[in-house]
UniProtKB/Swiss-Prot annotation:
Its job: Member of the two-component regulatory system DctS/DctR. Essential for expression of DctP.
SMART domains reported for this sequence: REC (SM00448)
Primary site of residence: cytoplasm
CC terms in the record's Gene Ontology section: cytoplasm
Species of provenance: Priestia megaterium
Protein's name according to its UniProt entry: Probable C4-dicarboxylate response regulator DctR
Origin superkingdom: Bacteria
Length: 228
């Protein structure tokens, strides 16, 4: 049976942001905010009380931050899915949030379209898996790659989400600035392709660019993920 409504719990300390997020969520068909908490401690209690399908958590909060809250949710065995909505963009926080099973990570500031995208992808995946007791590898691949394709609609023409994610992952593993040639070799793509993705990420303010001037030849651009 398809679930026609998903319950959502908001954990956000800023009342104005909390209200904006509530309005965003309830504009998307099939989602209802059933409760809201202003900190992680209160949020965990509300999860226990309401058992929401989806919990949307900010990372920076008083009393108990979002990452600690997410860890506690998993330690207690609560089955709510989690979307992180936060200004935190440092790689270590992103990695930990994903390791604890967040289904999406939305960076502030964001527009309604990004929240809508996250919720629609979540809804689509939940509807599809609710229709089956068992699933094949090809069916699972189709569901997961559909999410990449939907994200690709937001990218400039010629770029795709799968390659972008591979490049972001490769960059996150580096501890020093690297060139487009090194990215191309590491990811297994053409140098000109790597350069296009790196330029896009720089425009999105995700990369720090440094220029290396050698004795001969043209300067070399080197890139590193920003850690705020």
């Amino acid at each position: 049976m398809n679930k026609k409504a998903w319950t959502v719990l908001l954990i956000e300390d800023d009342p104005m942001v909390q209200e904006v997020n509530r309005q965003f969520i309830e504009q998307v068909e099939g989602f209802t905010v059933i409760a809201a908490a202003s900190n992680g401690l209160e949020g965990v209690q509300l999860i226990k009380q309401h058992q929401p399908d989806l919990t949307i958590i900010d990372m920076y909060m008083p009393s108990q931050d979002g990452l600690t809250t997410l860890q506690q949710i998993r330690a207690n065995g609560y089955k709510t899915d989690v979307i992180a909505v936060t200004a935190a963009s440092d790689i270590e926080t992103v990695r930990k949030v994903l390791q604890y099973g967040a289904v999406d990570y939305i960076m502030k500031p964001f527009k309604f379209e990004r929240m809508k995208q996250a919720l629609e992808q979540y809804r689509s995946f939940q509807v599809k898996i609710s229709q089956k007791e068992h699933i094949t590898q090809s069916e699972l691949d189709s569901m997961l790659f559909q999410q990449f394709e939907e994200k690709a609609d937001l990218l400039p023409k010629g770029l795709n989400a799968v390659t972008l994610r591979r490049i972001q992952q490769y960059l996150s593993e580096q501890n020093h600035p690297i060139s487009a040639e090194e990215v191309a070799d590491g990811v297994g793509i053409a140098r000109v392709t790597a350069r296009r993705y790196l330029e896009f990420l720089e425009q999105e303010n995700e990369l720090k660019l440094s220029v290396e001037y050698g004795r001969v030849g043209r300067p070399i651009n080197r890139y590193m993920l920003k850690i705020n």
